[in-house]
Every structure is written in C-alpha cells, then in structure tokens.
Amino acid sequence: MTAPLPGQEEIADPAIARDEMVSAFEDQNQNLRSNTSYYEAERRPEAIGVTVPVQMQSLLAHVGYPRLYVDSIAERQAVEGFRLGDADEADEELWQWWQANNLDIEAPLGYTDAYVHGRSYITISRPDPQIDLGWDPNVPLIRVEPPTRMYAEIDPRIGRPAKAIRVAYDAEGNEIQAATLYTPNETFGWFRAEGEWVEWFSDPHGLGAVPVVPLPNRTRLSDLYGTSEITPELRSMTDAAARILMLMQATAELMGVPQRLIFGIKPEEIGVDPETGQTLFDAYLARILAFEDAEGKIQQFSAAELANFTNALDQIAKQVAAYTGLPPQYLSTAADNPASAEAIRAAESRLIKKVERKNAIFGGAWEEAMRLAYRLMKGGDVPPDMLRMETVWRDPSTPTYAAKADAATKLYGNGQGVIPRERARKDMGYSIAEREEMRRWDEEEAAMGLGLLGTMVDADPTVPGSPNPTPAPKPQPAIEGGDSA
C-alpha cells in the first residue's frame, strides 16, 4: 500500500486528535501570558528591585514601549488587493471576498497578535447554511484567529500545518466550551454539554491540505512558529524604565519639596496638634514663616534634583530606539528644533524597511489563504495565474500628499516623463474605482476638445460597466407664430 504524502496522513480517531491538540494548545498558551503582560503594560512584581520597600511598590509605573513598537509596525500595514499573474489591476473577486469577511478590520488586529505572540492564523471554510445564516453561499468564510484561541502543529517536512485546533472559552474565560479540529481532508466541530463533548458538524472538504494558514512573525528560516517582537532586550529596557519612574516618583514625594529644620519653636506654632502630634503641614507648605520667639531659628535643605532620573530615562529611550528602529520623535527624544521632512523620512527608514519585510512574509500567507479559498469554493486546482499571485500593500512610508503629488507630476511630465498617467495615479494611491472614474473623465474631456461629445464616438471605450456620459440637451428651435405645443 502506498504511504500517504507528508502532511496528508489520515486522522484515525478525531476525538483522540482533538484531545491531544487541546492539550498542546493549553501548553503553548501558558507561554503567551508574559507577552500579553508586556504589551498591556501591566505591573510586573518581578520588575521591582529587591531593596524596594513594600509601600513603594504601588508607585511602579506602566511603561508602554512594547505597545508603542508593535502598534507602530501594524498601523503601517494595509492590504489593497491581490494581483494575479501579469494582470494590471487587482482581482475583483478576491477583493470582494476580502471585503465580505471584514478583513480590512480583522487583518490588522491579527498582525498585532502576530507581533505580540509571534504568530496568528488564517482559517478558511465553506459557509454552512444551517450555521452561517444570511451568508452568501458563494463567498468563503475567512477568519483571522489569535494564538490565544488557536494552535497549529507545523510539519517540518513541508513547512505547513499537519493539523490545527481552534477553541472557544465560556463567558468567564475559564473552560473550553467548543473546539474545531482542522485536518487535511476534513474539518470537525464539537461543543460541550454537561461536561461531555458532543459532535456539532463535519465538513469533508478533501483539499489534501489543512485549511489553516499561519501568519508567523518569522526572523529566521528555522523559525517555523514565529517569534515575538517583544524581545528580551526590549523587555529589560521596559522593566528598567518602570523602576526608574517608580524611584523618581518616590523621590519627588519625599524630597521634591525643600525640607526645613526649626529650632526653639513650640510645636503648636508650626501646626502640630498637641494631643495627637499630627503635623498639619501649614508651615511645611507656607512661603513665609513668622514666630513670636526671637530665639527661634530655621534652616532649609536643598530639594532633590530629578535630572539624574530624566537623564537615565533618555538613555533608555535611546536604547529602545536602537533595538526597535523607532524614530526619535516616537520616543519624545527629538531635538527642540523641528526636523525637516527629509530628516523625518531618514529617521523612519529602518521602520519602513522592517514593515516592507513583514509585508512580504504576511503577503505570502495571504496568497496561500486565497488559493485555498479558491480551491475550497470552486474545486480542482488553481489557475496558473494564481500561482503567481501578488499581495498589493499600501506604501508604508509617510510622505505628505503634496510630496506625492509633486513626485508623480515630475515623473509623468505631462506625458513626456518616465511613467504614464495611470502609473502616476496608482502612485498617488487612488483606488480602482477612482481610477476608472478618472479614465471616464479623461475620455469626456478628449471628446469635448475634439467636438465629439454627443456624436457617434464610443460611449464606453475602455471601462466596462461604467455609467455612460449624458450629453447636454440640445436647445429646441422656437416655433414661429405662437407658443410651442
């Protein structure tokens, strides 16, 4: 008997595979809590120094370097379409699938989870009319799942999932109440009823591949599962900044106001209750102190300087910028003089190159997901053009609108430059629908210039399905000898 191909082995008992995958999911989920605590800027007791008194631990600051870094990458990523083969424009059907699944909202959230935990997942399934009520049966269900709800076992022989599990917790988030097992040829679903697993659904898709595509934040070829962007060096700088801010707050509270020594004065004169001995702080905060006793003396210590703490925080911010590539202005370490536009772009160069690299990795995952969705909905193999699919990403840099317009105008050069008009419009970021409308206007202007508007010139020469231009009504000649009928 012929052995199954790698990654296409049959699952002998789905229930056993489910239990094994749920156990593996819970094991890996334990390692994700530390990532979440850093991203959420939670207080971490282990970040406090060993000599810090218990009373000061409540002053431990929330430092958001990890969130700032992760969000700075994710917010620059936006998919604009999928181009097949040598096509000039993005594929309309694939983009409709993207929009129908709200992936313009869900995908960026998946990128954030991938940077925090090292990976996210894309799941593909056929709509079930009994479950997915109101869903278009010709549109696949494409979802983005975080690693806190899903786990996929990667087969190192093929670099793709061998099986995957997705779980759903109860309202308290303590117990798993539903699970979906993805295998190369079938998808199984269960839910819990009175503590027992009950079969929910099954979908024998027969793809020969698990309909789950990881979104791994890979940094090396050997890194199959992805690595968190919250690296050990970034964690150590975050903890150090939290400790320094805690000490600065304590110093400001204890020694930020000048302390005074007063001799030869009765306690009642400086606002001390004679019965309880409680200081009322009137003299402590007063600007002018006056006492009746001529022998009274007062001396004052200098207030504590906090510059050493702020200098330390500046050095930590510079280390964070060196580790992450964040521009100085993101960390509030820019100079007093405003930077020029060229200086800002130069400062963002590392961040932009990192986003472009992430786009290439995530773009490959989206292309594989769209190919699986095509096979799932239409059957058979994908067309050759889909094997050369390209994910179209928005420009991750931040040029001003005026700068983009100036560059496009110079490159187009009124038809004499190095790029055509349509390329200039693409560089400006106009959508497909906007460019189609512009082409219609171009043709109308050309027809008006030649005096052909309203004649037998083709009403729709290039853009199928676009609205036809309506010519202006011709004036009716007046009827001699009376009013028009």
From Swiss-Prot:
Protein name: Portal protein
Disulfide bonds, paired cysteine numbers: none
Binding partners and assembly: Homododecamer.
One GO-annotated biological process of the protein: symbiont genome ejection through host cell envelope, long flexible tail mechanism
Coiled coil (residue ranges): none
Region (Disordered): 456-485
Example of a GO cellular component annotation carried by this entry: viral capsid
Protein task: Forms the portal vertex of the capsid. This portal plays critical roles in head assembly, genome packaging, neck/tail attachment, and genome ejection. The portal protein multimerizes as a single ring-shaped homododecamer arranged around a central channel. Binds to the terminase subunits to form the packaging machine.
Primary localization: virion
Composition-biased stretches (Pro residues): 464-476
Localization in the cell: Virion
InterPro entries in the cross-refs: Portal_protein_SPP1_Gp6-like (IPR021145)
Keyword terms, alphabetized: Capsid protein, Viral capsid assembly, Viral genome ejection through host cell envelope, Viral genome packaging, Viral long flexible tail ejection system, Viral penetration into host cytoplasm, Viral release from host cell, Virion, Virus entry into host cell
Family assignment from sequence similarity: Belongs to the SPP1-like portal protein family.
Pfam family of the protein (one): SPP1_portal
Entry superkingdom: Viruses
